[in-house]
Amino acid sequence: MNFYILTLFPDMVMNGLKSSITGRAISKGIINAEAVDIRDYTLDRDRRVDDYPYGGGAGMLMEAQPVYDAYKAVIGMMKNVENIDYKNCRRPRVVYMTPKGKTFDQKMAQELAGEESLIFLCGHYEGIDERVIDEIVTDRVSIGDYVLTGGELPAMVMID
């Protein structure tokens, strides 16, 4: 199984995943995990990924452009690594980690385990520009009725 994690903190994700049993599964090639740094896809020289919400409101959102470009890069990686022709099959599932999502449980874990690949989208700030969520996300998932600083820990929980 292949996991692609779109994140602002790739080192945090990979250090967590390379520990314990998950780390052994990665080193033996049983699973593959790639953390993709969304900042690598920003057009801003300062690598900023946040902006004010369109129409106003409190807080900052992750911008659509770097998130979408990171997603497109992962699709490109998947074509190369997995040798899949995505024109003739359904697109991979993209799991957006959000406290507003469906609660992750054993039934969902078994369902997702049947996928060849999963892309996890880890948000920060007040969330991600809704336009990119509407375009690429297939599943909105929460690991519980509480708020965390980002989606990295929930993604690691689900991968584990």
Ranges and model annotations:
Residues E63-I119, H124:
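S-adenosyl-L-methionine/SAH cofactor-binding core of RNA-modifying enzymes
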Residues A25, D51-G55, I119, R140, ...:
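Short glycine- and Lys/Arg-enriched binding-loop motifs that mark or flank ligand-binding interfaces
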Residues L8, I38, M97-K100, C122-H124, ...:
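Fold-independent oxyanion-binding glycine-rich loops
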Residues D46, Q106-M108, R131-I133:
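Short, well-ordered secondary-structure micro-motifs
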Residues I128, V132-D160:
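Structured adenosyl-cofactor binding patch, chiefly the S-adenosyl-L-methionine
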Residues M1-E82, Y86:
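N-terminal nucleotide/polyanion-binding subdomain common to many enzyme families
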Residues Y4-L6, E34-V36, R93-V95, L118-I119, ...:
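Hydrophobic/aromatic beta-strand patches that form the interior of the parallel beta-sheet core
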Residues S20-R24, Q110-G114, I136:
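Short, solvent-exposed amphipathic alpha-helical segments in soluble enzyme
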